[in-house]
């Protein structure tokens, strides 16, 4: 194959890339929020009045579990409420969507994960889909839809704080996420009703959070980001507000949950050895253990041992064991040590020595593990990592700063972000060779072109196969997409000139064009990993579903509230009838019996009609009121009598009691 290099053009990001929208558009987008969409926890921040605010959710927590649950009544819970019912409803509590998003069903990591997930994961269109039971009806969700629900929660958290609608966001992803995973994350934003203006790498966001006030001279910063499910290392230089990612490496499938899993395996084996019972098949028992193991792991960051106590763990038996820090480290030492290799790789790729690193920034909850801190310190010959940043909030903080830049906020100063593509991009040439067009760690956005030709005489079509990966042969790399350029005029091999152009935008999304220079005939593909990506129709359907869910949630809440009103009214009457100090001592036995009978009737009706609709609950409450109010009215000598406690109007009387 004849190849002729045409040109290689690298575009550096300048401030104008971020502020390219005209002023009118800035007014339209409102406040842009920064969202850290994590595997286990998510966090949202906003740049306001010259500083970043990390926003607490409705439970007062600054980080929200990335959990979605569906109750037997069909109610949808997101965040803390969802995580709280993991042990009682494991099959319908979904988490770890980030470990599935943008991956194919056959991906070994997906196959490994589904062994441990308590909910059902099925294959649909070569992708993993989640199947849950929503009020007696099975429903499947794409991982993007689950992530979208978490994003909706973050959006609502920001809206409650700001007091207005939020429509635009910056969302972070692990630096080592490939194109399909990035695109799927963007799709999740669309389903959640968010315009994702920028996808940025988590370590880059953390470096922004750390380095925003570092104005003096050039600094080399190593960001070590170990979260609940992913691990990234990035090396950045910061020079007077210009952030350049020099190299990045990591593992999109390593984090705190893997450490928990090792401890769980240990205790499951230990329990079997002691009792002869295998608890693996009991999802509730396994989730109880997961919850307590996570608590113990957190405790071990501050103390040397932690007791794990679970009442009625399995078949009525309790569980009681001690986990020491030494045992925790022993169970995970190979995983801990494996985090050091990407650090060394990043140093090698940057042509830097350990001594050239000015700051080490630790990000992600798992960097609180003392052994991880020790290993990082030892690798850098005793250099202390920087402590001035909350590892849980750093990524959202940096995303919020970037969001401030996109909002056109003047207080962000001259911040410029130079990010890189994490993997080499190229095409397949004769013999299955990977011909590289964009080497990994190239600053984005970027555009590279190269001239190729035909491999045989009178070849009418060339097939362009686009790959990402570092191996010399394409069979060992990851196929991103394929397209044909047809209509090449007959000519001897090597004569036609086919120009292939790779262009990556600021979100790391790739467009590939092939042009026959002789005829001007062109074809192009935007790499969105078609087999793995949602179609526009699917996204539209999911957006509609998400809106429908929000509407259903509202209706369901109304129905539950109406049911609760009837229930609390009935039980309030029952208590008062049974209390001689209250109604019980004031009514004739006949009236008392009438009310008791009516109340019992309604309580029995409630027990057998849990799924009745709003109108039924209202009607039953009215029936009860029509029996009770005339009787109570007699006590007070007329129809103007105050209603009993728990009846309509009770809210007012409660406030006015003397």
UniProtKB/Swiss-Prot annotation:
Catalytic reactions of this protein: ATP + H2O = ADP + phosphate + H(+)
Location of the region described as Nucleotide-binding (NBD) in the Swiss-Prot/TrEMBL record: 127-281
Compositional bias of kind Acidic residues: 648-658
Motif Prevents secretion from ER boundaries: 655-658
Residues that, per the record, bind ATP: 38-41, 98, 228-230, 294-301, 365-368
Alphabetical UniProt keywords: ATP-binding, Chaperone, Endoplasmic reticulum, Hydrolase, Nucleotide-binding, Signal
Entry's EC annotation: 3.6.4.10
Endpoints of the signal sequence: 1-19
UniProt-annotated stretches for the region Substrate-binding (SBD): 421-501
Regulation: The chaperone activity is regulated by ATP-induced allosteric coupling of the nucleotide-binding (NBD) and substrate-binding (SBD) domains. In the ADP-bound and nucleotide-free (apo) states, the two domains have little interaction. In contrast, in the ATP-bound state the two domains are tightly coupled, which results in drastically accelerated kinetics in both binding and release of polypeptide substrates. J domain-containing co-chaperones (dnajb9/ERdj4 or dnajc10/ERdj5) stimulate the ATPase activity and are required for efficient substrate recognition by hspa5/BiP.
Cellular localization per UniProt: Endoplasmic reticulum lumen
Region Interdomain linker, residue ranges: 410-420
One annotated GO molecular function: ATP-dependent protein folding chaperone
Keyword field contains Repeat: no
GO annotation (BP), single: neural precursor cell proliferation
UniProt cross-references to InterPro entries, sorted A to Z: ATPase_NBD, BIP_NBD, Heat_shock_70_CS, HSP70_C_sf, HSP70_peptide-bd_sf, Hsp_70_fam
Cited NCBIfam families: PRK00290.1
Family assignment from sequence similarity: Belongs to the heat shock protein 70 family.
Subunit structure: Monomer and homooligomer; homooligomerization via the interdomain linker inactivates the chaperone activity and acts as a storage of hspa5/BiP molecules. Interacts with DNAJC10. Interacts with dnajb9/ERdj4; leading to recruit hspa5/BiP to ern1/ire1. Interacts with ern1/ire1; interaction takes place following interaction with dnajb9/ERdj4 and leads to inactivate ern1/IRE1.
Protein name per UniProt: Endoplasmic reticulum chaperone BiP
Organism: Xenopus laevis
Organism phylogeny: Eukaryota, Metazoa, Chordata, Craniata, Vertebrata
Gene name as annotated: hspa5
